[in-house]
Amino acid sequence: MKQILLLISFFISLTIHAQTGKLSHSFIENFSDSVLENFRYGSTGTKAAFKWQSGVTSKTEPGSKVLLFKIDPMDSAGAGRGPEIISNNFTYFGTYTARLKVPDVRTVQPNTGAVIGYFTYFMDSVYGLSEIDFEWLVADPSIIYIGTWTGNRGQLKRIGRTINLDSGIIYNTIYKEGYKGEPFPLTGAQNQPETIEAIDNYDASSKFYTYGFDWYPDRLTWWIIHPVTGKKIVLWDYQGSQRGIPQHQSYYRMNFWHTNEWGLENNPNAIEKPLHPYELEVDWMSYDPFK
């Protein structure tokens, strides 16, 4: 009887643990004011005030107010050390959308090692990691990295796809275990679409683009809005297995940080410490939970 009571107590504690976070309502953060409404700032790196501002005039679109991130050359390498915003409350199954422009570093420092992350992230002590991401390495803004991380610490699992959207080339669609695990190609329903319509002259640093993902319990879809036609172009429609699809709530985020390990597909030398405070502009971010 004592063992049964202990088991019941354990499962109740798991349920309580899973329900402790407050879930966000539907929102759009326009970054039109210096004060954030649905996010908080959270960098673990230097405390330099210049690293972020909200409600500043865009240098790309003078009529727009934006969130401005500047990478600090004094920051050490590592995710979270650069500027980052984190949603005040948890987010869950729903549609996530953002409009942003990454910096162009190619004429100044072509081997810059810096990452833009548009993503969800929460490491739960019981259920492990819940991460869905879009990422760009600023040394080549024609390439998009999308995917998820799930699993407990030391047992992380990745599903991912790497795309050159200017040419429409899909470099890989894979599953791997751990950061340095062997990648295994995904096929069938986990590898759709098998071809992608190129966006002529796609360059994430040349203008603002709108990106998004739809997070379902059994499906994940990443997409971009074509800047001319307004058509939604699906970058990856992952289904056919629940493996790799986060099942617990997360925090909604945007960040900009230095990497000294992750080089480009076509340039592994692009891991240099940023020499200047390169700028990321974010026009808006939205979240619409499924009913």
Show the residue positions of the predicted features.
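Sec-dependent N-terminal signal peptides
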Residues: 4-14
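GH16 jelly-roll
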Residues: 19-291
